[in-house]
Amino acid sequence: MKLSFDLPVIQINKKEELSTLRERFEFCLIETYNTYDLFSSKTQILESVKACVEEELNDVSKSEIEEIWNLYIARNNKIIEILEELKEESVYGGNRFRTQAYGKAISAIKNVRVPIISGSQAQKLKGVGSKIAKKIDEILETGELRSLVQKPDEVRKRIDVLREFGAIWGVGPKTAVRLYDAGYRNIDDIPDKALNSKQKIGLTYYKNLQERIPRKQITLFEKDVRKILNELGNLKMCICGSYRRGLPDSGDIDLLLAYEGSRVPQNYFKRILKVLHEKGILIEDLSQGAEIYSGIMKTRDGIARRIDIHFVPKREWGSQTLYFTGSKEFNIDLRNLAIRQNRKLSDKGLFDEKGNRLPLSTEKEILEALGLPYIKPQNRTDLSKWS
């Protein structure tokens, strides 16, 4: 087996050793999969490959091996990128079954934390069928799919327009196609009468909602909201996502709330939302349920931003903050670790092999139950240091 499409240039101490190291790495990766599979941990696979490489090349450093590892992992991302494009085509083409097939395959591959080396190997994942496996082989061999490369320009332009329309909050594939078929070709063409009330909100704030939110804006928002909620009393709050992980910006704001008293007062979540509206924090409602709210908030400098507010049970605080903090890769690693222990981890909690929820209410308790130390949010990239 040869994984033949070109890897990017990588830095090795001696340039002439590049080809030898890469070939040895590839041989060892294939050999390792005779013992391990795609469900194994990154640490297991990487350590096995490293030991195999060192049998022939003694002066190779761990960092050099990890650098090549990351390039092979990038192939997984290339597979996902191309399958996402195929899924997008099927969505706008109205092919529901093909959309579902690509969606399942993409989800399965996203859960893999080690390099995929063939379509037949990927087919062992639930959701990857024989047709998609053949496409994966072509991607691994060439770095592309001929069917996409040869796509006519008019088809590409149509997809670009549909993608822009689909970025409007509340506009799904069917609405995007309807707008396109009505003759509209950009955001400015769309009249109010072509959209429902929620979609009009999405269009009104389209530009702001496409922008990343600077950390400073969220920090000021957190200060303002905490002051308001403290007046209500008995409320615990946490802004999760990339903000809690210490990153410089975020796509939207995920605010988690929990009532700390023994019994939640009737309609308490509605009261909270009403107060946030009265204080000028929330300016538009997009959707609202018993425990989840989606809307538009306004920053101190008057910029509209997307916000989701989750009102969670006190006993789920640990699992909910763990889930909504991320990162996505960290959550995948945690779920896979739980599966290897015959358990299930979700935003609702950690469950044993019989489906019983374990009485764990903090992140620390959940992580320790999985055999891990408490991991600070800013270190939650993946579990490679701990698995």
Task: State what each model feature region is.
Residues M1-F5:
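Non-Sec secretion/translocation targeting segments of pathogen effectors
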Residues K14, R22-T32, K42-E56, E64-I68:
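Amphipathic alpha-helical segments in structured regions that serve as interaction surfaces
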Residues F25-C28, T32-N34, V49-C52, A101-K110, ...:
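Amphipathic alpha-helical segments that form the core helices of the histone-fold
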Residues T35-S40, L57-D59, G93:
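Charged, low-complexity interaction regions
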Residues V53, W69, R96-G251, L257-Q288, ...:
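Accessory alpha-helical DNA-binding modules that contact the DNA backbone or grooves
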Residues E67-G93:
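Patatin-like phospholipase
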Residues P265, E284-S387:
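An acidic, glycine-/histidine-flanked metal-binding catalytic module
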